[in-house]
Amino acid sequence: MNNSVREPTRGRRGSPPVADAALSVNPPLSVVLAGGGTAGHVEPAMAVADALRALDPQVRITALGTSRGLETRLVPERGYHLELITPVPLPRKLTGDLARLPLRVWRAVRETRAVFEVVEAHVVVGFGGYVALPAYLAARGIPRVRRRIPVVVHEANARAGIANRVGVRTAERVLSAVPGSGLRGAEVVGVPIHATITTLNRPALRADARKHFGFTDDARVLLVFGGSQGAVSLNRAVAGAAEDLAASGVAVLHAYGLKNTLELRTPEYGEPPYVAVPYLDRMDLAYAAADLVICRSGAMTVAEVSAVGLPAIYVPFPIGNGEQRLNALPVVNAGGGLVVADADLTPGLVARQVVRLFSDPAQLAAMTAAAARVGHRDAAHHVAKVALDLARAERDTASGRSAGGKP
């Protein structure tokens, strides 16, 4: 196993690392990021980790996760230390399912407290999901027994999940991606996303990006993707519209998913390219090459697409609590995109909408500008600064407690 990943501590009360004399007076700030499970929880945490390190190169960053999540791969790849705890799968609503998991919750909380002690945590930043709940509970103190650790809650979705609804009860700061998350006192900051996206200059990179994918400089490019696994309904609808799109001079860059296949017609000579790939490992180039996007509306997707100023046709995932539609509404209401129900997505609709937008440069330009206005490029920096401010205050308070001989 990667030595930057450590298994659950099972309640071990570990001794903090011995600091040298220079650091004992003013030890490094220690931040724990609780955002495991799906990419929607892990990627914002990693974006904040990068921002923390940019603001304070000496900061100690610990990611909290489980052996079941994507964090076991993504966190070490980004160069950060990962501590594993017992998974606590959560129901999407407050039901009896959670009440039947007291032992698992207790075990995860105990393991998390041990992590906090070992890394001498000054602040916990939670991003929701089944890793965040034990972190929020473990951060609660007991007077004269165990110190309380400040908590920052970040909610990426338009409708908050159960973990974050629990976390806000004792959080010092509550941050959200969009208004109306249901979390009291939430400050809207956007979704933390990777610096390769937030610093992307699409016009400057466009020529190289289009050359990379085989498009001409003056091509009209439609980008299609359904997340890392693709989306079958998007694949069928856009592939079915290929002939009409080609006839209208629209080139397509289509990421159809690693587990999917895509049936395409044989293109006619001279038609715009239809570039189909299982996965795009350079989303910055894909965004720079595109003029319009068809995609799902997960929180990370909406955040990235709007941050780079791309107009989009959002097709919310039809299963769940409707949060994907809500994620897209701020951009759509601002004029930066459209929402199409998954059940309504047909080849005919794709052809009509895409051709209509490409035939109206003024509207496409207005949508581009609107998307850019709504997009947040500084969310990771904002969350990191909030965390460091709280961590610094906690470190100073802890130093005062130690000097006064108080627990």
From Swiss-Prot:
Keyword Glycosyltransferase applies: yes
Residues the record lists as binding UDP-N-acetyl-alpha-D-glucosamine: T38, A39, G40, N157, S228, Q324
Enzyme Commission (EC) number: 2.4.1.227
Superkingdom field: Bacteria
Keywords recorded for this protein, A-Z: Cell cycle, Cell division, Cell membrane, Cell shape, Cell wall biogenesis/degradation, Glycosyltransferase, Membrane, Peptidoglycan synthesis, Transferase
Function statement: Cell wall formation. Catalyzes the transfer of a GlcNAc subunit on undecaprenyl-pyrophosphoryl-MurNAc-pentapeptide (lipid intermediate I) to form undecaprenyl-pyrophosphoryl-MurNAc-(pentapeptide)GlcNAc (lipid intermediate II).
Name of the protein described by the UniProt record: UDP-N-acetylglucosamine--N-acetylmuramyl-(pentapeptide) pyrophosphoryl-undecaprenol N-acetylglucosamine transferase
Region forming the signal peptide: none
Naturally occurring in which organism (per UniProt): Mycobacterium leprae (strain TN)
Keyword Glycosyltransferase (UniProt): yes
UniProt catalytic activity: di-trans,octa-cis-undecaprenyl diphospho-N-acetyl-alpha-D-muramoyl-L-alanyl-D-glutamyl-meso-2,6-diaminopimeloyl-D-alanyl-D-alanine + UDP-N-acetyl-alpha-D-glucosamine = di-trans,octa-cis-undecaprenyl diphospho-[N-acetyl-alpha-D-glucosaminyl-(1->4)]-N-acetyl-alpha-D-muramoyl-L-alanyl-D-glutamyl-meso-2,6-diaminopimeloyl-D-alanyl-D-alanine + UDP + H(+)
GO cellular component: plasma membrane
GO biological process: carbohydrate metabolic process; cell division; cell wall organization; lipid glycosylation; peptidoglycan biosynthetic process; regulation of cell shape
UniProt-annotated location(s): Cell membrane
Family: Belongs to the glycosyltransferase 28 family. MurG subfamily.
